[in-house]
Design a protein with these regions (language model features):
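Acidic, metal-coordinating catalytic segment for phosphate/diphosphate chemistry
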Residues: 103-107, 127-128
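Conserved catalytic core of two-metal-ion nucleotidyltransferases
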Residues: 24-90, 97, 112-139
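C-terminal catalytic-base region of ester-bond hydrolases, centering on the histidine
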Residues: 95-96, 103
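Generic structural signal for hydrophobic residues
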Residues: 19-20, 95
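Short coil/turn linker and secondary-structure boundary residues
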Residues: 15, 93-94
Length: 140
């Protein structure tokens, strides 16, 4: 999304966090932030771009991923290969549904989008973290 300020990447929950972290650290291109949630690995590229790596979990009738404050639920999806900027990535086959579930009207630019308040598919997993986030929004 043009107005998004970071890159979000999803990996399945079976992905070994230790192996993933080691590969990222050994590349020399990223700083790994301290983990505040077992569901998300936050890194920053040397060029300053923030990247959130979300672990996706499969339940019997939904897929979900989470951060330190919220959990987002999605309709189960298949992955397809998709070419972007000369590379091939796996994306949800029905990417419109996935993006709509996570962002609402994702085609409309929203400069002050806030994943804690503007995502239609969220549920709160840590009220303390959410309150801290809300207080920061009031101050900044």
């Amino acid at each position: 999304l043009k107005h998004d300020k970071d890159i979000d990447i999803g990996v399945w929950s079976e992905t070994n966090l230790s192996v993933l972290s080691t590969k990222i650290a050994c590349s020399g291109l990223f700083d790994i932030a301290p983990m505040r949630s077992p569901y998300t690995l936050r890194i920053k590229h040397v060029n300053g771009v923030a990247i959130d790596i979300f672990f996706h979990y499969r339940d019997h009738d939904s897929y979900w991923h989470a951060g330190s404050k919220l959990r987002w639920n999605n309709t189960p999806f298949n992955l397809i290969s998709y070419g972007f900027l000369g590379n091939v990535f796996l994306i949800p086959e029905n990417y419109d549904l996935y993006l709509t579930e996570n962002y609402g009207n994702w085609m409309q630019e929203k400069m002050k989008f806030d994943s804690a308040f503007d995502t239609p598919n969220h549920e709160i997993v840590n009220m303390y973290e959410l309150k801290i986030h809300a207080y920061k929004k009031l101050i900044i």
